[in-house]
């Protein structure tokens, strides 16, 4: 039986891994995009939505957007958008496929290094379905986790080929794959240290003879990789600083960071063993951690590290697995605080592999010691009696099934914003981020009362969080509650005086109050804080138009189109401004672009139809296009807008369809309530009856 399993294990294990991974995560294909980073990474990112164009590719390699430099991740999202558009199923499917590839690669790497099919399969199975890894797979914005790990694992596989047959080209492949991993997510900066650990075990490149000299040589061998790690770390710090993502020492004192890091190391281990109450966001405890808890964590980590080093000569996998966990978690442990979270499940995607290795090799060795039946074979190591091996296999399978069931349940929480953040609020305390994002979800559904409650709770927990005040202000503004909106936006600017959205939204509020000049000041302040803020340019143009400064307004609309050519509003306003200047051909082009970006926009259809029909000597095809556009605008308004009907009548007249022009003008006149517009319609109707188009 054992021989049969070993003979077919290398075919059976990958198949089982694939089936298990797909069974747990297949449900993500029915999940939505989330309001937690998915908008910035995909749904509202104009460069991603351009697809793989020269401009978007250049942006990917030069931007620090989202406080990161990860061009390969951006390119993967652009390719997804080109293939699937905004259908979330395709984006989730790609992330799932990459995770599956990582599972199979991890198995192949461990089996190649150790020769152990079943232990390697056990590690890969834990990696595949552990609930802590759900976040990296089920969250589209965390594509950077799975894709950076893909390149890191490919680099390790290439390294194994290099070790087997050293050569410059093979080493260059290792360096190249590592560089791609760093350009996907800098979390893999610790790969050179991981390779040194693998040199010790299981590659055994540090034997007892001349160990120090060999270590120096192996360290020198890693220098090109260390240079890349250093460069990536510097770039990452610059990116985080530019995006103001680095936590200040005032908010997160160094002592608090060290304490949280020590406790988090132990907490991740506990969650690996008992993955309960997992959440998308864990609030940072700050300085509230008990000193006894910090000292206890330090003592635990010190003792385990000491024991692992002591066992290194006889059980090298313990030291390698433990140090893998410690070293690969360093970039995300919070000594350099990024964001507000105290911990994050996604940070364990690679580090837990080290603990899985300790379990996969350590538990069988422990059982061997307990049953006192060791059989040493140079090629196979320690061999368990079949009955003990079978029992151990059953326990391992049960453990994997339990973890898979927990992961399946955890994956379900990522279905949409309501389930995700609702669950986070149930399993955490004082979670301002969860309240805020749940508020965003309610606001998107038009449930203003519930959204206000959630925003208010977020502000109660984090009074100094400018974005929460801004979100509440936006909601009040949409509800036409001008005074409460102004209060919130002024709170934003008190907290963060250079907050671009705060200035823009306060400007919009003041514009509704009629304080146009003050609104203009805030729109300009928003642009100064963020020169690529297209919405602020549009609002500035609107305000300038309102006080008759049409030339400046036109320049502002041109700036809006320049910084964001994919914003339909910018093209619409620019078209309106150009038409007022008599630049009809240019105005038509921008209305057409607005409709390309926003196909179901009746006002844009109406304005474009008007220009096509009323320009000097419109062609027959232009007149037909005007009719089609104006008719669709009327259909979308259920033929209840006299302005749209007037445009349709003019379009019919331009196409020499006089009876339809007369009928439509009469319909417009019958529902028109504005005396001036009614007079225009009467005059137009008289001309139509003479089969003559009146000048607009």
Question: Predicted segments — roles?
Answer:
Residues 1-481, 490, 494-501, 505-508:
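Polytopic membrane enzymes that build or remodel cell-surface glycoconjugates and lipids
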Residues 413-419, 444-457, 478-491, 498-501, ...:
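Structural signature of tandem alpha-helical TPR/SEL1-like repeats
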Residues 423, 430, 464, 498, ...:
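Short coil loop/turn residues that delineate tetratricopeptide repeat
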Residues 427, 461, 495, 529, ...:
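Structural marker of alpha-solenoid helical repeat scaffolds
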Residues 433-444, 467-477, 501-512, 535-546, ...:
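Conserved alpha-helical positions within TPR/SEL1-like repeat arrays
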Residues 617-624, 632-642, 647, 654-658, ...:
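Terminal, low-structured helical/coil segments at or just beyond the last alpha-helical repeat
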